[in-house]
């Protein structure tokens, strides 16, 4: 379900997978002031496209739907690996958006090798390498679409942030190597436990909440994909789940739907969480000096919270205090330490340029004087040797 609000009118989009369609409708209130009821009015019904781009053998089985600012409708369809299907507001099929990449597994690389050797007919009979389908998506306040891929084996494109052209921004920013969910795969009693990200929520402030189907946990990241918190889990006690299905946020609260328990659990932000989010918000607004205080408070409460060291390092780096920035980056950020060191080195060279110039000039003059003196000494010795040689030859001639 996705709710789009435009000029005070709310349109509800429902992915009706049981009937192979997406329905968009508005809700009107009828009746008197004392007795009112709500009635849905269907606006558009989106069904399987009758277009050559859509494989007619694939059932139109929508699982998720969302709408962007231009009123384009994006639909996740099971068994479609080309990305999300895109429809116009009126229901016309416009193509696909944001397909995943094919993961470079050993089988894929071997198939690519054999295709170089096989004939065209033999290559056609080989099994095609296709990407994993998109599992879920969300859209932020800046109209960027985020997609997640739930896979037991693939590690490619687990989380993507897509621009209007369908390009993954995280790849260009160097975030593609980040690990989302559990950093390590666990093995227990013959079973493999690795994260399967089944849903994503992007809050109004850019915070990313990823829901892990395997462990029942929520992994919360900031807008630069730095891990903030992990909460939830599998179990029967309060705050744990059996089978998680969806995650959403409203304000600072996070809501998780458990399909087996038929319950929604609300996670309220703690005081420590509020301090961390406040520090991130101040830093993103360019208030670096003000961001230092909440980061220092976070470190006071938890000296092992590594993100606070990075936050303080970034704050001091942007203030130009590179020595202090290196001190904080040293604990948990090689890239931050390198940036601070480069800036410190540039400042050191600029502040001491005159001294360096004088030292270099003195060295050059010294080298020149030494070279000149050495050449003169060599010339004198050469002259003396030639004179001595001539005198010896003259003595032999006289004899």
Locations of regions flagged by a protein language model:
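Eukaryotic scaffold repeat domains enriched in small/polar residues
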Residues: 1-322, 332, 339-399
